[in-house]
Amino acid sequence: PANRKFLGFTVSKQGARIKVADKAIEKLKDTIRELTRRTRGHRLIDIVRELKTTLTGWKAYFGIAEVLSPLREIDKWVRRRLRCYAWKQWGSAGYRELRKRGVTVREAWNTSKSAHGPWRLSQTPALSLALPAKLFRQMGLPELAQARAA
């Protein structure tokens, strides 16, 4: 076989690059899904703290991976999960929360009155502006695909 899986990593013959195995990524996503269930009722900062312990440990183990694109995708996916969680938590105050965070009246109105669900709305420009990646970094959310010092 071209790819070998060992201890959560996949090593390919071509170029011999180490990447995180698909099964390990799916297990991480399952853990994140558990922590970011929209019905938990915890504050966003508490969810980020819980995620921090999981992601820091995962990053420590899988930090030697050379293929970073799947890790970048996980980073984006985690931020989207958190935006979805926050939107669901805001409920009917969504418009007010968006306006408070600098979203224009029109964008906030269109987003808050949308018929789409929280997951779909979590990728809208309004929520990305209200809850940017920088905010999650300030809360302490680690990035898996962060460049390593050589």
Give, region by region, the residue ranges found by the protein language model.
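Non-catalytic terminal/accessory segments
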Residues: P1-A150
